[in-house]
């Protein structure tokens, strides 16, 4: 039986949570479907595709700032859209896909346009909470088109952004799957040895708070730094791990701001930059609390943390909060209430058995 062909849009060259999910989807469906990916450039994503023998086409830079979009960004997106739709139509004519699949946020409207012009069914996979009103309006408009057959949302709070009545009928909420075994049996020892070497001290009795994700403003690593500083001022011996790295020049500027903030707070010996890592299971095993301060549709990191029997602290307006209500594994703080953030983390660190579904002691106690 001939496999159906799927053309996949990905707008990042790296591999973060969304790209992990795209790769997982392709892995799970590889026996029934063939895939071809549209990606911006060579990088971590292209390396993963090569491992799977999945063909890809380079589309050029598709980087846009997160959050509310100004006029300059809107004009840039308009020009970027023209170029990408034109090039994508060329790929469609050559590859002849049966289905267009768009998990990359910038590519959602492009796939709807291409699906309409090429008469191909489109599936959207929404991972994000869109902070920009213009973006929400555009997605509700395009989501109503006949070419968009299904809209998969990773959480209810993501799906609820599609308010157009006809478009909302296409929404199906499917929580992202996670390989529990991959994260449930990590080796904490080697990470602790690495941290002790970097910090030049033993970590027995020290609590570790970890944030995982690309270093960028919408991930809010600045909140983690504030939490570590606040806990230090409260007399807590805590180390913060920043797992991930920068992608764009704006990200690199943000990281420099974070480094200056760390210097100003006097906590250089309490923050460890871990960079991009593949041994997340081991890092989680060495962690007491996973911190998710970003407003995301559904944090894959939170799911991985729960698989590793680690508690999660997140704010009360994210997909991770929705997940927390189901799993009961951790606690939350009020959005924009700075005083409650450190208290939430402190509560988790002081009550390691508060996790309703899982209990696991600190690897250093």
Listing of model-derived features with the role each one plays in the protein:
Residues 44-50, 241-268:
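Short, structured helix-loop element that forms part of the nucleotide-activated donor/catalytic region
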Residues 84, 102-108, 126:
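Short His-centered aromatic/hydrophobic patch
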Residues 157, 177:
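Carbohydrate-associated surface elements
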Residues 249-255, 268-276, 283, 295, ...:
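Active-site donor-binding acidic/aromatic loop of nucleotide-activated sugar
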Residues 292, 326-327, 331-338, 347-353:
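Conserved acidic donor-binding segment of nucleotide-sugar-dependent glycosyltransferases
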Residues 311-314:
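Short hydrophobic beta-strand element within catalytic cores of glycosyltransferases
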Residues 358-365:
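Conserved small/polar residues in nucleotide/adenosyl-binding loops
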């Amino acid at each position: 039986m001939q496999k159906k062909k799927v053309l996949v849009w990905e707008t990042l060259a790296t591999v973060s949570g969304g790209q992990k999910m795209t790769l997982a989807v392709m892995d799970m469906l590889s026996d029934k479907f063939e895939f071809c990916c549209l990606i911006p450039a060579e990088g971590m994503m292209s390396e993963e595709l090569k491992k799977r023998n999945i063909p890809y086409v380079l589309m050029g830079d598709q980087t846009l700032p997160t959050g509310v979009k100004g006029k300059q960004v809107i004009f840039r997106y308009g020009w970027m859209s023209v170029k990408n739709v034109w090039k994508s139509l060329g790929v469609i004519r050559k590859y002849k896909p049966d289905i267009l699949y768009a998990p990359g946020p910038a590519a959602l409207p492009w796939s709807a346009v291409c699906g309409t012009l090429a008469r191909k069914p489109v599936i959207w996979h929404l991972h994000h909470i869109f902070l920009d009103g213009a973006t929400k309006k555009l997605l509700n408009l395009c989501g109503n088109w006949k070419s968009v057959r299904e809209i998969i949302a990773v959480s209810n709070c993501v799906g609820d952004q599609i308010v157009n009545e006809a478009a909302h009928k296409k929404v199906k909420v499917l929580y992202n799957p996670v390989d529990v075994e991959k994260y449930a049996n990590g080796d904490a020892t080697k990470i602790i040895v690495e941290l002790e070497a970097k910090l030049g001290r033993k970590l027995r009795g020290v609590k570790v708070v970890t944030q995982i994700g690309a270093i960028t403003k919408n991930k809010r690593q600045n909140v983690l730094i504030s939490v570590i500083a606040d806990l230090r001022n409260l007399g807590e011996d805590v180390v913060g791990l920043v797992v991930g790295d920068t992608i764009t020049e704006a990200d690199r500027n943000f990281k420099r701001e974070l480094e200056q903030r760390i210097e100003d707070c006097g906590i250089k010996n309490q923050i460890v930059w871990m960079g991009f890592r593949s041994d997340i299971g081991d890092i989680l095993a060495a962690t007491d609390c996973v911190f998710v301060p970003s407003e995301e549709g559904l944090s894959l990191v939170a799911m991985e943390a729960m698989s590793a029997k680690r508690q999660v602290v997140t704010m009360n307006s994210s997909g991770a909060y929705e997940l927390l209500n189901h799993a009961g594994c951790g606690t939350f703080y009020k959005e924009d209430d700075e005083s409650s953030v450190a208290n939430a983390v402190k509560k988790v660190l002081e009550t390691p058995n508060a996790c309703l579904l899982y209990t696991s002691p600190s690897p250093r106690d």
